[in-house]
Every structure is written in structure tokens, then in C-alpha cells.
Amino acid sequence: MDKRIPVGADTLRIRNLGLQDYDTVWQAMRDFTVRRDSATVDELWWVEHPPVFTLGLNGQECHLRDVGDIPVVRCDRGGQVTYHGPGQSIVYILVDLRRRALGVRQLVDALELSVVDLLQSYEIETERRANAPGVYVQGRKIASLGLRVRKGCCYHGLSLNVAMDLSPFYRIDPCGYSGMEVIDLKRLGMELPLADVQQNLSRYLVRRLGYSAPFYGEENRMIK
């Protein structure tokens, strides 16, 4: 199905792209955003990445303490340094903010609250911090976000730690904070298939972002 389908602003395509190199998806997000116009349907891209550290626009190399053989990519999202790896569920948010009448702060709230909704459904208590975007459990970060807005449209997105090797986080200062601890769902006693987490979080994202007509696009197919 072509991305320029004649539908309303409440339509959202959801794709599962599987395991993909970070650079490949980053370039695809930029290309999608450059090419999109008023007829382009908004999309969510679910993805996993092989191990990689990413430095955002505000990223300082002093927060890369011992990267070892894990590659480092300097990218154009907001924020500092983070880690992506297998067992982490990442959703990229490709949304026309002007069309949805959303400000960046409203978008950040919607993304964080979607994770809060999900974790509350698992009976996990959460917190948010005004000075450190993301979602925290027992004082440890479980979800991070970083966005870029270009001509009123956003890309990049949100990552949720599901069942992963957390040790690379301790080779950096996560999000620029020395000593910040992280956690995942598995360590909270929730051993869930990644696909189930993605499906459930998609439902909360759709609700918080105000879409009424979500549908699933091509599985495991990179955008051209």
C-alpha cells in the first residue's frame, strides 16, 4: 500500500521492522520526513537494534566512559547519550505535529504517559521527572526518549527496556547523568515476548496520540 493513501489525519500506520542497523533506520526516518507532505500518513516503526551507543545533538563525549567495541553514532535527535541493543523495544514516531495540533511538550507527555499506562497495566509503579525525560521505576530508568522536529514533523522516538543486557549502560553516563541506574521489565519479574509489549504499547500510544484509525503495514520491510 502506498504511503500517500486518501485517508484522514486520524489514520496511523504501524510497522514492525524487526532487527535493523541503527544507521539504516536513521537514514530511512530522515528520508521519510523529507519526502512527506500533507497527504502522507503518520507512522510508528517498531524496531530492535544491534548494540550501539548514540549521541544526540547535546551529546558530550565525556559521557562515553568505556565504549569498548560497541559502535558510537552521533545523530540528530535531542538529548545526550544512550544505548540501544537486543531486547529493547524501540518505537520511532513519524508524526505531522502541525496536522495533529501537537506541541513538542504535548508529544513528550503523550509518549511518557503511554509507557506509564503500559506499566500500570502490569501493576508496576512508575515516576516521571521534569528535568530528566523518560519513565522510571524504583528510581531506575526503564524508558528513554529523544526527538527531532523538522518542518513541523517529528522523527526519532522512544525506547523501552524489556529483557536486555543492561551492562553497556554502565559504560556511559545514561542521558548525561553520572550514576544513573537502569532497569528492564525482566528484572521486575515480567518475562514478556517483545511482540506482546509492542502490541500493548501501540494501543496506548494510539490512544494518547488521539488516532482513531490505526492499521498495520508491511512487516519486517524497510521503508524505501
Swiss-Prot record:
One of its GO terms (molecular function) is lipoyl(octanoyl) transferase activity. It catalyses: octanoyl-[ACP] + L-lysyl-[protein] = N(6)-octanoyl-L-lysyl-[protein] + holo-[ACP] + H(+). Pathway: Protein modification; protein lipoylation via endogenous pathway; protein N(6)-(lipoyl)lysine from octanoyl-[acyl-carrier-protein]: step 1/2. It comes from Nitrosococcus oceani (strain ATCC 19707 / BCRC 17464 / JCM 30415 / NCIMB 11848 / C-107). It is an enzyme of class 2 (transferase). Transmembrane segments: none annotated. Substrate binds at R77, G78, G79, Q80, V81, T82, Y83, H84, S144, L145, G146, G157, L158, S159. Pfam families: LplA-B_cat. The record marks K141 as: Lowers pKa of active site Cys. This is Octanoyltransferase. Its main location: cytoplasm. The gene is lipB. One of its GO terms (biological process) is protein modification process.
